[in-house]
Amino acid sequence: MSSRKIKEEMLEIIAPELYAPRHRRSVKAETKSRVKKEEIKSKRKWKRPQIDDLLTEDVEVVGATAPRRPYQWRGRKVKRVLRPGTVITFTPGVRSRERASKRSSDEIFADEDILEQYERGEGEFRYGKRSKAEAAVVLDTSNPTPSLHPVTPQMPIVHTSAAKRSAVPTVEVLAPKKRRFTESSDQLAVDMVTETSTVPPGTAVLLPARAVKQARRRFPVAVESKKPEHMVVEEVKVRDVKPVAPGIGVQTIDFKVPVDAPKPPVSITEQMDISSTPAKKVAYGPANKIIPVAWQHPSQMGFPKYVRPKRRRRVARRSKSTGRFVAAPRKRTPRRKIVLPAVRYHPSLDTVPRSQVAIWR
């Protein structure tokens, strides 16, 4: 029993909550003399006519379908996300004019895995037209030649005039499991450095393209067009029919096709005239013509780094001269034609501090 229930029981004994009935203003009721009517109720209860009763009276029911249930989103494991391609526009403060074209919730929202359902053909994509995939069953997967292993799967050869759900031949390519690389390795071992090469190996330098003044020479390239040769079959071996099912057998026919031996690579060297003189450098004008010299405020130039002051020797100070200090006349220069104006600052705004000051940033 909770503590709240205990407190309520204790309060009922000490201070019971008894409220008087609410006082309401009495309304004077008008009395009218009415004649009492006695209604005779029939003991037979009214019964809703069933569908079987209607059919007995030769009544045709048109469009008798069950009402569609609302989609139960509660309890689903997926989230409600927008369907791919759904456009929702919202302008704050502007009422939508398209009041008549309202879309349902199922049209806008969908499951989170809607694309995966489309791939698997589940959910709402379970019905409707779909492409029929031809299901093929391989009747025999045995290998009568153990020294060869299959390289490709069995591919069925279906003719256009073949009947539906009929047996069709298959083709499979097999290759030997172990190959002798002694002969092929001897053929591939070719000395890449030929006697006609003018540059010793490891000393060739690739010049940049801008250093070449002469145009590239176009060498004639011989293009040979070969006609497709017919496949050469060395040996054809017809094996016995292997029974697979009652009344069905599989017959294997082996075709031995020769494979061309790998040809060694051939190196071709050609001499080309390459100029080794570097290209001329482009001489640009002074940068002052592009970027004018401007005087910056000391606040824009930053502060010098802190340098530890060197140990100074004490020197006898000179006595101050009693003469009057006269400033030397400054030589005025004409104003430069720059974008920023020439400015003069107060002597207190000096770019070079008189003493080394440590500034902590």
UniProtKB/Swiss-Prot annotation:
GO CC annotation, single: host cell nucleolus
Pfam family, one: Adeno_PV
Main localization, broad class: virion
Positions of region (Disordered): 311-331
Induction per the UniProt record: Expressed in the late phase of the viral replicative cycle.
Sequence intervals crossing the membrane: none
Cystine bridges: none
InterPro entries: Adeno_V (IPR005608)
Compositional bias ranges of the Basic residues kind: 311-321
GO biological process: viral release from host cell
GO-annotated molecular function: DNA binding
Superkingdom assignment: Viruses
Stored HAMAP family: ADV_CORE5
Family designation: Belongs to the adenoviridae core-capsid bridging protein family.
Quaternary state and interactors: Monomer. Homodimer. Exists in equilibrium between monomers and dimers in solution. Interacts with the histone-like nucleoprotein; this interactions bridge the virus core to the capsid. Interacts with core protein X; this interactions bridge the virus core to the capsid. Interacts with the endosome lysis protein VI; this interactions bridge the virus core to the capsid. Interacts with the peripentonal hexons. Interacts with host NPM1; this interaction might play a role in virus assembly.
Function as written in the Swiss-Prot or TrEMBL entry: Associates loosely with the viral DNA to form an outer shell around the nucleoprotein-DNA complex and links it with the capsid by binding the endosome lysis protein. Dissociates from the viral genome during entry. Might be involved in nuclear capsid assembly of the viral particles through its association with NPM1/nucleophosmin.
More about this protein: All late proteins expressed from the major late promoter are produced by alternative splicing and alternative polyadenylation of the same gene giving rise to non-overlapping ORFs. A leader sequence is present in the N-terminus of all these mRNAs and is recognized by the viral shutoff protein to provide expression although conventional translation via ribosome scanning from the cap has been shut off in the host cell. This protein is only encoded by mastadenoviruses, and may therefore play a role in mammals tropism.
Name under which the protein is recorded: Core-capsid bridging protein
Record lineage: Viruses, Varidnaviria, Bamfordvirae, Preplasmiviricota, Tectiliviricetes
